[in-house]
Amino acid sequence: MGMPNLGDMMKQIQKAGEKMQDVQNQLEKLVAHGESGGGMVKVSVSGKQKLLSLRIDPEIMDDAEMVQDLVIAAVNNALDASAALAQEEISKAAGGMINPADILKNMNLGK
């Protein structure tokens, strides 16, 4: 059995790097949504887990503690959805060659 061709290995590494850059770009475009309190608080986050929008039903604004709890729950819900979308994109790009959870951790997006 011969030694692997170093040139071919370098090409594969370069292709993998290009795929991961494509995934990074895709994650910027993905939007995940979360809500709590039956829709009284709604949030949207990017695939890179940046908060994009926050909507709070004005009817609940008198109860600050409840608003805080609902915002936290909605944000966490959206972040979980965002992480799932990111893992799905990485899995598609990797074609089973790598563990998406490891990539998310390296991108500071995993738990």
From Swiss-Prot:
Gene3D superfamilies: Nucleoid-associated protein YbaB-like domain (3.30.1310.10)
Stored SUPFAM superfamilies: YbaB-like
Principal subcellular localization: cytoplasm
Subcellular location: Cytoplasm, Nucleoid
Record keywords, A-Z: Cytoplasm, DNA-binding
GO molecular function terms attached to this record: DNA binding
GO cellular component: bacterial nucleoid; cytosol
Domain of life: Bacteria
UniProt keyword annotation of Metal-binding present: no
UniProt xrefs under InterPro entries: YbaB-like_sf, YbaB/EbfC
Task of the protein: Binds to DNA and alters its conformation. May be involved in regulation of gene expression, nucleoid organization and DNA protection.
Subunit structure: Homodimer.
Descriptive protein name: Nucleoid-associated protein Clim_0875
Lineage: Bacteria, Pseudomonadati, Chlorobiota, Chlorobiia, Chlorobiales
